[in-house]
Design a protein with these regions (language model features):
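Contiguous, structured surface segment used for ligand recognition
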Residues: 1-98
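Substrate-binding cleft of carbohydrate-active enzyme catalytic domains
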Residues: 95-242
Length: 242
């Protein structure tokens, strides 16, 4: 199943950058074919790419390495189109974790389709960890006062994005604040008692105010339970252990 997705990636790249509609199949290759294989004799994170007049051969030690090799081949097609200069590449990552951190709490809330496009870009550049930061931009079930004027990401969308990333060997990691950066939440009538600033919900909005007074009052005995509730709702949506 994984190889099918990578073949579709390559097929789409050839269509867009070389103007070629190339079908794919399984079985014994012929002259002129591009061949994708997992070779367990190679180290798990390594792939070799050979572009010769008679064929293109991509061998990888694992599905993840095969995916990375396809990204390299796609980059080469983007640069050269349908006429690819011959080359041989042996490649592997120097860093086990290659991460990207995205703040989804400022400005417009990204749609799922857009986030999938981001995942495709991260996959192209072999990024394998994506930390997704949210505040009021996730639909916490008991915090409708904080997100009702926005279009927050839902649990179903997060789980779908997690599956989409996993298929591209990207670990989607949950990220949320547990102390500060909670203006939209702590300025609601439901949660204002947890704010360090008394009567915070009565103060008109300003960016200075939002930046200075959006911190949990840690002396409030309910603060810890509140934070644990946020984590318990958001964390299970991800397959990541982080």
């Amino acid at each position: 199943p994984a190889a099918l997705l990578y073949a579709q990636m390559l097929q789409g790249c050839l269509r867009e950058y070389a103007g070629l509609e190339v079908p794919f199949t399984r079985g014994k290759p012929r002259a002129g074919d591009a061949v994708l294989t997992v070779d367990t004799a190679l180290p798990q994170n390594r792939y070799t790419l050979s572009i010769m007049p008679e064929c293109i051969t991509l061998k990888a030690g694992s599905d993840e390495a095969l995916c990375n090799g396809v990204q390299t081949l796609c980059q080469y097609i983007e640069q050269h189109g349908a006429v690819l200069p011959a080359l041989e590449i042996e490649d592997w990552p120097d860093l086990a974790n290659r991460g990207y951190y995205q703040d989804c709490s400022r400005g417009r809330v990204p749609k799922l389709d857009y986030l999938k496009q981001v995942a495709d870009i991260l996959c192209r550049y072999k990024i394998n960890q994506w930390q997704l930061y949210i505040e009021h931009t996730y639909l916490f079930r008991d915090l409708s006062e904080a997100w009702r004027e926005d279009t927050p990401l839902t649990a179903q969308e997060i789980m779908e994005l997690d599956d989409y990333c996993a298929a591209r060997h990207i670990e989607l990691v949950p990220s949320l604040s547990t102390f500060g950066h909670m203006y939209r939440i702590l300025s609601t009538k439901t949660c204002c008692d947890l704010c360090e600033l008394p009567d915070s919900e009565k103060i008109p909005f300003s960016y200075t105010y939002a930046g200075n007074h959006h911190t949990l009052n840690v002396s409030n005995p309910d603060a810890l339970g509140f934070v644990k509730g946020l984590i318990d709702e958001y964390r299970p949506l991800f397959r990541s252990s982080k």
